Amino acid sequence: NQVEAAVQRPVSSVFFEVGERVCVSDGPFASFNGIVKNVDEEKSRVHVEVVIFGRVTPVELAYNQVEKIV
């Protein structure tokens, strides 16, 4: 049931915006900085471009794997 699924899905209090600079805090790309290219609020995921070995690499991460850079 979609209503039950929506109730069980944790809601993040952190909101990301396209173009925002973030730091990856968890996973294989931890400590890399990147730029948010897309936000999927339904799945609580962000698409971030990070520079790895001099190349821009798109990665998809959960909200809890990135932190805003202030």
Swiss-Prot record:
Question: Can you tell me which family this protein belongs to?
Answer: Belongs to the NusG family.
Q: What does the function comment of this entry state?
A: Participates in transcription elongation, termination and antitermination.
Against Pfam families, the record matches this protein to: KOW
The UniProt entry's GO biological process terms, in alphabetical order, are: DNA-templated transcription termination; regulation of DNA-templated transcription elongation; transcription antitermination
**What is the name attached to this protein's record?**
Transcription termination/antitermination protein NusG
Cited CDD domains: KOW_NusG
In what residue span(s) does the KOW domain sit? Answer: 18-49
| GO cellular component labels | cytosol
| Transcription regulation is among the record's keywords | yes
Entry coiled-coil feature ranges: none
Taxonomy, superkingdom: Bacteria
Species: Liberibacter asiaticus (Citrus greening disease)
Q: Which InterPro entries match?
A: KOW, NusG-like, Rib_uL2_dom2, Transcrpt_antiterm_NusG, Transcrpt_antiterm_NusG_bac_CS, Translation_prot_SH3-like_sf
Query: Is the Transmembrane keyword given for this protein?
Result: no
Q: Which UniProt keywords apply?
A: Transcription, Transcription antitermination, Transcription regulation, Transcription termination
